[in-house]
Structure formats: structure tokens, C-alpha cells
Regions:
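Conserved functional hotspots at enzyme active or ligand-binding sites that engage polyanionic ligands
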Residues: 1-110
Length: 110
């Protein structure tokens, strides 16, 4: 579970993985991989109205990303989650896109 990877995050408490889930990008520094937590930013379907929202980063479906369409990383919803909730690795994003998402989180935090 490394920085820039796209994973499916289970949002409920069930261990069966049959509940609600969403895609997230891992932003945690890889040096912290020994911890059972990751800092993630959720992905939502891109809408043209997001262009004016600096906390929404457009994420195209680049090769090996696991994305099937254009998504938006919602930096306002940054959170730390247990690695046990990260159920399926979908792919990874280029460093350039990951850094754009991290910069948006920095703007949100101030």
C-alpha cells in the first residue's frame, strides 16, 4: 500500500467486504508504511462544475490507474484509515497527479 496507489476502501464495519465502498488515492509517505494506517483522499465521478473548486483535482483514467473514467480527488475529504479497510488495489497514478492531489490537501489544511 504505497503513495499514489488507487484502492477500494470499505466504508462499513463488515469484514465480508459486501458493504459500501469507494475508490481512494493513498497519499501517505511510504516511509510510514510500517503503521497500519494510510492517509487517503476519496475519488468521485468528475463533473464540469468542479473546475472552479480548487480542492477538487481532476484525475484522468491513465494507464494502469484502474480508473474507467475521469474522476475527481476530493481533498476536503482527506482522512486517515485502517489498512484493514483497504480491500482491493486497483492501480496506481503518476507521481505528477499524486503531487497535485497532495498540493490540494495542503491548500485545504492551510
Amino acid at each position: 500500500m504505497n503513495r499514489g496507489e488507487v484502492w477500494r476502501l470499505a466504508l462499513d464495519d463488515s469484514e465480508e467486504g459486501e458493504g459500501i465502498s469507494r475508490m481512494v488515492i493513498i497519499l501517505s509517505n511510504d516511509a510510514l508504511a510500517v503503521l497500519p494506517l494510510r492517509v487517503v483522499v476519496p475519488l468521485v465521478a468528475w463533473r464540469d462544475t468542479f473546475v472552479t473548486a480548487p480542492w477538487m483535482v481532476r484525475v484522468p483514467p491513465v494507464l494502469n490507474s484502474g480508473l474507467e473514467g475521469v474522476m475527481a480527488a476530493d481533498a476536503l475529504q482527506v482522512r486517515s484509515v485502517s489498512t484493514a479497510r483497504l480491500t482491493t488495489r486497483l492501480g496506481s497514478l503518476p507521481e505528477r497527479i499524486t503531487n497535485q492531489v497532495a498540493a490540494a490537501v495542503g491548500e485545504v489544511i492551510g
